[in-house]
Swiss-Prot record:
The chain crosses the membrane at residues 263-283. This is Putative OX-2 membrane glycoprotein homolog. The keyword Cell membrane does not apply. It is a single-pass membrane protein. SUPFAM superfamilies: Immunoglobulin (SSF48726). Residues 24-136 form the Ig-like V-type domain. Glycans are attached at N45, N57, N72, N195. Keywords: Disulfide bond, Glycoprotein, Host membrane, Immunoglobulin domain, Membrane, Signal, Transmembrane, Transmembrane helix. It is found in: Host membrane.
Length: 292
């Protein structure tokens, strides 16, 4: 290497290092239940010359921290400082915080959102601006809802009528297990709920030869949804019975399902009334026209 290159090498290293901005570290994928408070983490291994930290949902700005003067910050003995907090931006409720940890030369940005429905699953990008250069990383959120399983059975004359209803996200696979056999429908009844979850219902009837043939036998409703399995089981009695799995689930998820069911409850009778009214009107018009 020539003497000139040797003399220029330190200068080149300084120039390169001055413009090198490390890439932020973040979890590439997060999995939470619907109704949870989701925390996105974004960390940059430097605390030098940071001008701003921003979070974007696609191209929409949802959080922005601007650092005016790092020299005026006061740090604790362990080099840890909380600098900024935001609670609302662009009419969106967020909980956004920015931390510096000088001892470990690390800057961390936290963004919390409330995942109220399956439609809140998204990808967020955090962007650090350092020395007028931007560096970004993206974290994607996947939402699930553990199956809520309800098993119901009753007798209709000489038949045991069994219904298994499951609400979850993604849409669950549902089967009924009885007397050592597994029963499933190729096309079950499916209802889409307000929060994005699905309610799947499967029904079967079993003929009994004697009145007490099925009493004391175990019947189960099995549900699977995205690596999650749930079930509700009961011993068949001589009368009507309902059983539900006892796992905790989000209130938001239940609210979404119930609200959708309420809408369904009043819409169907209203449609029937309208149809009957139209038919009565048409019949009346026909009678008048015939008489005239």
């Amino acid at each position: 290497m020539s003497p000139l290159m040797l003399r220029l090498l330190p200068l080149l290293c300084i120039i390169i290092s001055a413009h090198f901005v490390p890439r932020p570290e973040t979890s590439p994928s997060l999995v939470y239940e619907i109704g949870s408070t989701v925390t996105f983490h974004c960390r940059l291994n430097t605390t030098t010359n940071i001008q701003s930290v921003s979070w974007y949902n696609k191209s929409r700005l949802i959080s922005n921290h601007e650092i005016q003067n790092m020299d005026n910050l006061s740090f604790t003995d362990d080099g840890y400082v909380f600098i900024h907090e935001l609670n609302k931006i662009n009419n969106l409720d967020v909980d956004s915080k920015l931390y510096f940890h000088i001892k470990h030369d690390r800057t961390t940005s936290l963004l919390k959102i409330k995942a109220r429905s399956a439609y809140d699953a998204t990808c967020l990008t955090c962007t650090f601006t350092v020395d007028n250069e931007k560096t970004s990383a993206t974290s994607c959120l996947k939402l699930i809802m553990k199956p809520i399983v309800v098993l119901y059975f009753r007798y209709l004359n000489n038949f045991l009528d069994v219904t298994c209803t499951v609400t979850s996200y993604p849409k669950p696979n549902v089967v009924i297990k009885f007397l050592g056999e597994v029963y499933k429908r190729d096309i079950p009844m499916v209802r889409q709920n307000e929060n994005g979850s699905s309610t799947v219902s499967v029904s079967f009837t079993f003929k009994r030869r004697t009145k007490l043939e099925f009493v004391g036998k175990t019947i189960s409703c099995l549900a699977s949804s995205w690596f999650t399995n749930q079930k509700a089981s009961a011993l068949v009695t001589s009368g009507e019975h309902t059983v539900q799995n006892h796992d905790e689930y989000s209130k938001e998820a239940v609210k979404g399902s119930n609200s959708d069911e309420t809408v369904f409850t009043w819409i169907v009778p209203l449609i029937l009334i309208l149809i009957i009214s139209v038919m009565v009107l048409l019949i009346s018009m026909c009678i008048v026209a015939f008489k005239s």
